[in-house]
């Protein structure tokens, strides 16, 4: 229903079930329920028009498919959920820990290599009642599994999307990919990819101050962006984007010419997306 009309849902103990707001402004309620449990819906005193849709989703799941949503109540132990990646891709996971009165959910990704499961990232912490917590990986073709550990009082909604990424990047300065003014480029690093990559921009006017927006979306590590002016060996700027910082701004000098941007990983575990915008 419409949020402004304040539809409320209560469980069998008459405790209010908390709602999350969907992208289109509707209210969505979710809670782990026992078979035969009764819920109560309180309608507003004044009603214009309200649509109420109810449904039951099975608790617990095994393997995963892209764009499907799964629900699982915590067991106190780690549960594993296999999935496959067919092409080099940016893979974005969304985990929502629904019960605000519960505790933290933990998650990480493992890859199957030579018959053994190998962990490829740091642990992600999903706080209670934190909806739409996203974390992104750069993954190659292969078999993977999502590991989740949640308290028995927590209910998690889990989904992922996958977007294939071309490996057509420049590993040499002489082959640097050009970024046009008011344009941007993005790609991924996987755990096995180590070589630095090169991009370039052209500053054609000294009247306006130009900037580079340097961004990342990773679970582990981060990226180093080193900026050079054509003809100069010494870098004019070095910027690291890591930790909680999703992006940093590099202010460019008011000097005409070609400038090169070299991007490199900060750690072996670094995997995920990066973005360079020129404005």
Regions found by a protein language model. Give the residues of each.
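Edge beta-strands of jelly-roll/beta-sandwich modules across compartments, strongly enriched
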Residues: 5, 42-57, 62, 103-105, ...
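Hydrophobic beta-strand segments within beta-rich accessory/binding domains
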Residues: 1-2, 39-43, 51-52, 82-100, ...
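Noncatalytic modules at the cell exterior or secretory-pathway interfaces
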Residues: 31-45, 137-151, 251-266
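Non-catalytic extracellular/lumenal accessory regions of secreted precursors
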Residues: 12-24, 44-87, 160-200, 206-207
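Exposed aromatic-hydrophobic patches
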Residues: 27-32, 81, 131-138, 246-252
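Short, surface-exposed beta-strand/strand-loop-strand elements in extracellular ectodomains
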Residues: 3-15, 102-115, 221-233
């Amino acid at each position: 229903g419409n949020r402004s009309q304040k539809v409320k849902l209560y469980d069998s103990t008459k405790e209010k079930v908390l709602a999350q707001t969907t992208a289109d402004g509707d209210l969505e309620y979710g809670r782990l329920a026992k078979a035969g449990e009764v819920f109560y819906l309180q309608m507003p005193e004044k009603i214009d028009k309200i649509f109420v849709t109810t449904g039951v989703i099975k608790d617990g799941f095994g393997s995963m498919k892209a764009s499907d949503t799964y629900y699982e109540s915590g067991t106190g132990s780690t549960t594993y959920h296999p999935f496959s990646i067919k092409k080099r891709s940016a893979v974005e996971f969304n985990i929502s820990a629904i019960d605000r009165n519960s505790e933290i959910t933990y998650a990480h990704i493992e890859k199957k290599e030579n018959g053994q499961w190998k962990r490829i990232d740091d642990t992600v912490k999903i706080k209670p009642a934190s909806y739409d917590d996203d974390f992104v990986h750069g993954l190659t073709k292969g078999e993977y599994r999502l590991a989740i550990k949640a308290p028995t009082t927590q209910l998690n909604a889990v989904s992922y999307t996958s977007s294939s990424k071309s490996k057509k990047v420049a590993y040499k300065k002489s082959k640097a990919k050009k970024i046009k003014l008011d344009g941007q480029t993005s790609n991924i690093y996987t755990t096995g990819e180590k070589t630095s990559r090169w991009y370039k921009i052209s500053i054609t006017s000294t009247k306006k101050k130009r900037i580079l927006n340097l961004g990342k979306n990773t679970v582990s590590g981060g990226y180093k962006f080193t900026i050079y002016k054509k003809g100069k060996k010494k870098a004019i700027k070095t910027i690291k984007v890591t930790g909680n910082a999703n992006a940093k701004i590099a202010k460019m000098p008011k000097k005409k010419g070609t400038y090169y941007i070299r991007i490199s990983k900060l750690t072996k575990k670094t995997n995920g997306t990066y973005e360079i915008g020129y404005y």
